[in-house]
Amino acid sequence: MELDSDPHILLTNDDGIDAPGIRALYDALQAVGTVTVVAPDRNRSAVGRSLSYGRTRSSPDDLSLDLESDSFTSPVPHTDHELGYAVDGTPCDCAIVGVNAIEPDPDIVVSGCNAGANLGAYVFSRSGTVSAAMEAAFLETPSIAVSMDTLGYDTDLEPSDFEQAAEITATIVDGAPGTGLFDRVDYLNVNVPCPDREPNGYAITRPTRVYEMDATVEDGGFQLTNKLWQQMANRDIPDSEDTDRHAVLEGQVSISPLRIPYEVVDTDPVRTIIERIL
């Protein structure tokens, strides 16, 4: 799918429509296209691919079944906002609404800019930012997820802190037409270094497959520990040089060109099980 040189851009996020990251992107993207914002009305971080499907039912027995079309519907409330539409829903709700219900149809969806990096294959089904981009890709609309590393950056974030990430994103959108990028790629996952660091170039990366979560029981309660963030804080990571996490720690802008999952792998063991069942 070739991107238009003057694209209609759908902008969403998971930090909420009043977050500084989406404001910075809105300002920067207006220079390269027409921007429509459809974003959650509050912080919806780490909700992954979840939808509000069924959440607004008036009772457990109200399935909102449309008998004529044999499809389920679920209202997703919204209010008007100075940037666009503030949706009482998830980032994926916003992507679906923006792609299918808002005119004109978007040429590209941009999700972000997230306060905090989204690195590694494991985050794709967890991060609301990346999930919105994936949702758009499943809806056959090119998309970009944009996040900024904030580890160790202890100031209250303002739109100005995201200006560098926003300008980089606008440059990518502006440079895409004529390249055939979205004929071969469904979406990009872009991660930008901390705002107090000048980017040390760009790196085309693959999402790291390293995943180290731990769980313990202390004083009768469960605790989760993300060892990956501990490693990043210590700048001691096991990832190879071609990965997104390595690039960001080196101060580079990480760009991962991705296709939507999921691929079918070795089917022979499954076939063996079926033969045993039959």
Q: How would you describe each model-predicted region?
A:
Residues 97, 103-152:
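Internal, conserved structured core segments that host functional sites
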Residues 160-278:
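Electrostatically charged, flexible surface regions
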Residues 12, 38-39, 111-114, 146-147, ...:
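Short beta-strand segments
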Residues 12-18, 123-125:
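Short, glycine-rich nucleotide/cofactor-binding loops
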Residues 138-166, 170, 177:
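Phosphate/ribose-phosphate-bearing ligand recognition and processing surfaces
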Residues 2-5, 24-101, 105:
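A cross-family phosphate/adenosyl-ligand binding-site feature
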Residues 15, 43, 90-91, 114-117, ...:
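Short glycine-rich anion-binding loops that position phosphate/pyrophosphate groups of nucleotides
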